[in-house]
């Protein structure tokens, strides 16, 4: 069983690149 800290870290590592990619896609879509 993973510790809560490990789960949170894994989620953060997975979400941050996704959010950055989404923001980049939205910025490119505007132009």
Curated annotation (Swiss-Prot):
It is a single-pass membrane protein. The chain crosses the membrane at residues 7-26. GO terms for biological process: photosynthesis. It comes from the Eukaryota. It is found in: Plastid, Cyanelle thylakoid membrane. It holds the Pfam family PsaM. One of its GO terms (cellular component) is photosystem I. Keywords: Cyanelle, Membrane, Photosynthesis, Photosystem I, Plastid, Thylakoid, Transmembrane, Transmembrane helix. InterPro entries: PSI_PsaM, PSI_PsaM_sf. HAMAP family: PSI_PsaM. Belongs to the PsaM family. NCBIfam families: PS_I_psaM (TIGR03053). This is Photosystem I reaction center subunit XII.
